[in-house]
């Protein structure tokens, strides 16, 4: 017997549950489920199986679907707080639903998806199931009003995108009243779909809540920085494609200083100039049109290289976007003002329980364990995999690769119209292939980040006989290509990667479009030495004829180099954001205290506290308290405090970004940039808190018509330990 009889009686699918312990690929994970082997079942265990049984029954009733064994196994993995690696077409939607039904009585469950379309689709599909199980369910989308969002966030089970959840969290922590907040329940459990895309690929880019900034930097200065960089000789710069950095050589440093009339470019009073030059260098040499970004209707739109889609509404902060606009001779938009920011890594840490699903997590198992303490469990496929994965074809030039591609296309057409999915490594490459196919009179469709609005329609037809779709990595995730006719099913989908991606996971996601649920299919990658993948090599060993040595630099080897670099980058992002994390918690807790002050006694007490900390004298304190008791309402005092605190916090974050931008140069002097940043952030945070209190006191004195002013604050180093959460309790 594999489970206690009493527990088995609570479910109509004992074979499915028992099967869990028989799968050899999951043996190492069996200890997570020892609680189910108890001779005397605990009440919560019986409740878990009762919930599972109810969920299966309602799915059968309302959807006419019966969950596979593997989906139930996946649900147990998610419920235990791990990552379930499930291949394309294996039913992650029902797996997440079963997990939510099993765990929603413990606390709210958020099912986090990568886009509104998936969130809405799954919400509408499963709403009757959840309600039949006794749970309320909500949907949060970008287009909703705050009132509708607030209502949705009160539900037991909530569907929401990762971006919307993150921005709602940031907006709540910049709200000017408690009523304006939309997330009102504790962050209990998150089930993250495409967990590697959210916690790995997006981890390097913080979520930034921006407001309208002021024109602190003139257009002329952006243009001057760009013109200075354009004038640099090759010997004046050092590019590292592996780390995506560009730095000035000593000669380049001297050239820029002379051209701009600066004595020391990296002196404290030249930090803005250095920042502008650094951004201009990156814009010129690392940000490429139709690869990192595209230009649409006179605007720069950023491309997610891992996902191939335009990142709607996302702009680089800290002046890099303006540097690109100067480079492209576009209208330079005002730099946004950062109101609040957080990484997805630290957003995930706010939940008591997190788990996730994806088709490709095993290669990043170490990072999931190190950064999130999440184990990755591979779930077997329901049907045997029938896809044939061919060895890579290697070519010296992209022209040779294109010629081979045309031969594959001709053969597919001759065999009866085998559907082809051709995925290029960039928008630029996909558009070039489309022009080639047009010249060759090959009927095809093109889908890139430029026209992703028609994605659903194009993907829907990609599994039809005779279909040839040229696209990018955007077809590799969040799409399900179904074979639509008997001939297509007989031949199977053929996935052709033109160039390897920056990560093996991207390639595996692409391969996974073929061979879903036991379908026939094939995949192959055509790789050349001219591909973007090989731009990361820094001084590679060459043959006598000056070509890259394939034996030393296989695509797999180069991908591992990139993945190692990306891991270090994500870890670095987290380390720097951790410096801000404790400070952010202090500020958010302080804002909560301000928002929760409800009466005039709180106003006077809090004003008195601020005044003492801002070094006011006894007469000032007495005059201030007397004036406030007669002239200031609680609502107005809250508004004053919040406006000053938020404005100063925004300026503080901007200053830290400038400091962080120049930290890499500290390593040249044998110093540790992270330690330097921690020390300077600690110092400036103490000064920020003192100056904020002073600014609030000055505002209160002005309102109270008090003639005296607070004493000038002393500048001092402030230990981070002095500003823990306990300080404001």
Predicted features by range, described:
Residues 2-3, 7-544, 588-589:
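Conserved P-loop NTPase motor core
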Residues 294, 298-301, 313-314, 537-539, ...:
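Extended, charged helical/alpha-beta scaffold domains that provide interaction surfaces
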């Amino acid at each position: 017997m594999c489970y206690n009889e009493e527990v088995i009686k609570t479910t109509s699918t004992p074979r499915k549950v028992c099967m869990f312990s028989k799968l050899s690929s999951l043996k190492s994970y069996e200890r997570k489920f020892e609680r189910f082997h108890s001779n005397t079942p605990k009440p919560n265990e019986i409740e878990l199986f009762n919930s599972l049984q109810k969920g299966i029954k309602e799915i059968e009733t309302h959807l006419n679907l019966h969950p596979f064994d593997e989906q139930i196994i996946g649900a147990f993995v998610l419920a235990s707080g791990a990552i379930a690696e499930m291949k394309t077409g294996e039913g992650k939607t029902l797996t997440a639903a079963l997990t939510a039904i099993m765990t929603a009585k413990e606390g709210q469950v958020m099912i986090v998806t990568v886009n509104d379309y998936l969130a809405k689709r799954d919400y509408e599909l499963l709403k009757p199931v959840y309600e039949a199980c006794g749970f309320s369910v909500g949907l949060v989308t970008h287009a909703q009003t705050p009132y509708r969002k607030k209502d949705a966030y009160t539900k037991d089970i909530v569907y929401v995108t990762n971006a919307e959840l993150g921005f709602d969290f940031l907006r709540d922590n910049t709200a000017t009243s408690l009523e304006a907040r939309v997330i009102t329940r504790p962050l209990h459990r998150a089930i993250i779909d495409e967990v590697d895309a959210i916690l790995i690929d997006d981890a390097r880019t913080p979520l930034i809540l921006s407001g309208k900034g002021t024109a602190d930097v003139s257009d002329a200065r952006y243009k001057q920085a760009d013109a200075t960089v354009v004038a640099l000789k090759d010997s004046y710069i050092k590019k590292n494609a592996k780390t995506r950095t560009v730095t000035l050589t000593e000669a380049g440093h001297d050239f820029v200083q002379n051209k701009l009339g600066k004595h020391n470019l990296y002196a404290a009073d030249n930090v803005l100039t250095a920042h502008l030059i650094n951004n201009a260098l990156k814009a010129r040499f690392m940000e490429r049109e139709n690869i990192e970004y595209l230009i649409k209707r006179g605007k720069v739109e950023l491309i997610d290289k891992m996902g191939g889609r335009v990142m709607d509404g996302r702009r680089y902060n800290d002046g890099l976007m303006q540097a690109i606009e100067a480079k492209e001779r576009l209208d330079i938009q005002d730099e946004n003002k950062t109101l609040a920011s957080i990484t997805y890594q630290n957003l995930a840490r706010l939940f008591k329980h997190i788990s996730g699903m994806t088709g490709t997590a095993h290669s990043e198992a170490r990072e999931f364990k190190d950064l999130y303490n999440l184990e990755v469990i591979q779930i077997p496929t329901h049907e045997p995999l029938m896809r044939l994965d061919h060895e890579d074809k290697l070519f010296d030039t992209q022209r040779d690769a294109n010629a081979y591609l045309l031969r594959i296309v001709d053969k597919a057409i001759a065999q009866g119209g085998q559907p082809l999915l051709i995925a290029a490594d960039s928008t630029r490459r996909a558009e070039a292939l489309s022009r080639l196919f047009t010249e060759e009179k090959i009927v095809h469709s093109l889908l890139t980040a430029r026209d992703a609005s028609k994605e659903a329609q194009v993907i829907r037809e990609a599994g039809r006989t005779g279909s040839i779709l040229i696209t990018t990595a955007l077809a590799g995730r969040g799409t399900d290509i179904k074979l639509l006719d008997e001939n297509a099913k007989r031949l199977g989908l053929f996935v052709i990667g033109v160039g390897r991606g920056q990560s093996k996971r991207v390639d595996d996601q692409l391969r996974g479009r073929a061979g879903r649920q036991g379908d026939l299919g094939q995949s192959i990658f055509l790789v050349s030495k001219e591909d973007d993948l090989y731009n990361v090599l820094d001084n590679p060993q060459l043959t006598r004829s000056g070509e890259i040595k394939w034996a030393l630099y296989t695509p797999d080897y180069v991908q591992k180099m990139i993945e190692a670099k990306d891991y270090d980058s994500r870890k670095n992002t987290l380390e720097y954001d951790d410096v801000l994390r404790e400070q952010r918690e202090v500020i958010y807790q302080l804002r909560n205290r301000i928002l929760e002050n409800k009466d005039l006694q709180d106003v006077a007490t809090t004003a008195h506290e601020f005044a003492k900390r801002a070094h006011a004298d006894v007469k000032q304190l007495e005059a201030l308290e007397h004036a406030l008791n007669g002239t200031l309402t609680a609502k107005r005092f809250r508004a004053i405090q919040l406006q000053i605190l938020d404005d100063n916090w925004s300026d503080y974050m901007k200053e830290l970004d400038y400091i962080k931008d120049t930290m890499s140069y500290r390593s040249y002097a044998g110093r540790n940039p992270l330690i330097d940043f921690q020390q300077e952030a600690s110092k400036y945070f103490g000064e920020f808190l003192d100056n904020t209190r002073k600014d609030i006191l000055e505002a209160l004195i002005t309102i109270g018509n008090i003639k005296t002013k607070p004493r000038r604050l002393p500048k001092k180093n402030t230990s981070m330990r002095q500003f823990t959460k306990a300080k404001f309790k």
